[in-house]
Amino acid sequence: MTQDKILILDFGSQVTQLIARRVREAHVYCELHSFDMPLDEIKAFNPKGIILSGGPNSVYESDYQADTGIFDLGIPVLGICYGMQFMAHHLGGEVQPGNQREFGYAQVKTIDSELTRGIQDGEPNTLDVWMSHGDKVSKLPDGFAVIGNTPSCPIAMMENAEKQFYGIQFHPEVTHTKQGRALLNRFVLDICGAQPGWTMPNYIEEAVAKIREQVGSDEVILGLSGGVDSSVAAALIHRAIGDQLTCVFVDHGLLRLNESKMVMDMFARNLGVKVIHVDAEGQFMAKLAGVTDPEKKRKIIGAEFIEVFDAEEKKLTNAKWLAQGTIYPDVIESAGAKTKKAHAIKSHHNVGGLPENMKLKLLEPLRDLFKDEVRELGVALGLPREMVYRHPFPGPGLGVRILGEVKKEYADLLRQADDIFIQELRNTTDENGTSWYDLTSQAFAVFLPVKSVGVMGDGRTYDYVIALRAVITSDFMTAHWAELPYSLLGKVSNRIINEVKGINRVVYDVSGKPPATIEWE
């Protein structure tokens, strides 16, 4: 099935991924590529329209130039912020540094146009938007007209109606721009004429066919962690090739309570997936003995996982493919780190950490999907919603939620405390009937390797401390601590102290990010 596509050229904005998310939310497929994507590749991609992202640079910097042949393809182009300046500069207009940076909320007065018709906030012909720019367009290219302005930016929006070129000096992709989604939908659906055929049933059908074509009769191995990405990848691949898939589930002793059983029940028993369960708790605990530095713990856990997985992989002599749960943000971030051009700077282990001499071919069926799309896919494939929508869990597991040295005793105490906290979050609702688990973005318990004095019954206790952490965030870059009801915190504390022998004090973390990080290590 062929589907209409939108191409986004990324000039380095921190929020370019949000453009892609908004387009996908309109059920139109899109891809995000570096601004220097060759013109022949753009033609081969055959987009219905092109969006030029924002970016931190100046149009006068030669290192940040897209191929201007995009303006000769006869398709609509939308320039956002820097993208608008790039469009104006290369089509004969002028761009100059602004007398003052415009950052934050602004009101744009609009003039009726194909892009803005019927879209407004409050007052007629007014848009509440989010600006973030220094340079600005000072002279329009020939054939363009102003369709929006602010007091400090006379050319805040421009259009060439004949060629369907549009420029906007604000960010429609962020939630602060109230009608941003409507503007992007107008461009994608109405101006570009893209048909909204990007749906999960269509994706499953295409992905299954692609996996079958790619793999043929070969066998595939996948490291199953119990996390969302690897679980959904396993379910999708199994839907496509059945028993040709073998999953290796490494239990390092640092999983959540009953997680090992849950994974085995779900995949091996309910879905009929071949799963090799490796109990490696002793091996991991031995390697972690005496280690207190968080980064060293992470490296040890990562190295041991690879060692255990490799040992199992060598036994599966017929496996030709290694499957991974790589998702689209991983691909984008790794591309940015390699080229130094895109907006992100971290390399993801799924994409950048494979051994150079790896003999297995790589299968990444989720690499075109964002996280929320992966969750939607998981539900469509029959995975339990409760599992698919679980809060994030770190790769090293409880190893980075036990401060200092990791011991089996500590992990067992933490597992029980964490499970009680999550149970009560799920069971307690706000006035609208929404559970506090769903109201928070991430919640967990932390084991503190310090003892405090307590009194239980007629006796004195000297036991360990548990810290509770719950945050609310939209992007995990910044976060607010969740203002949980005192009654909920009190119930969690009472249950942990009474039910988990070895804990006599519970504290709640009220630090935001920044200055604190979400995880304690």
Curated annotation (Swiss-Prot):
ATP binds at S225, G226, G227, V228, D229, S230, S231. Residues 5-197 form the Glutamine amidotransferase type-1 domain. The active site is at C81 (nucleophile), H171, E173. Homodimer. GO terms for molecular function: ATP binding; GMP synthase activity. Its EC number is 6.3.5.2. This is GMP synthase [glutamine-hydrolyzing]. The keyword Metal-binding does not apply. One of its GO terms (biological process) is GMP biosynthetic process. It catalyses: XMP + L-glutamine + ATP + H2O = GMP + L-glutamate + AMP + diphosphate + 2 H(+). It comes from Neisseria meningitidis serogroup B (strain ATCC BAA-335 / MC58). It is an enzyme of class 6 (ligase). Signal peptide: none annotated. The gene is guaA. SUPFAM superfamilies: Adenine nucleotide alpha hydrolases-like, Class I glutamine amidotransferase-like, GMP synthetase C-terminal dimerisation domain. One of its GO terms (cellular component) is cytosol. Catalyzes the synthesis of GMP from XMP. Keywords: ATP-binding, Glutamine amidotransferase, GMP biosynthesis, Ligase, Nucleotide-binding, Purine biosynthesis.
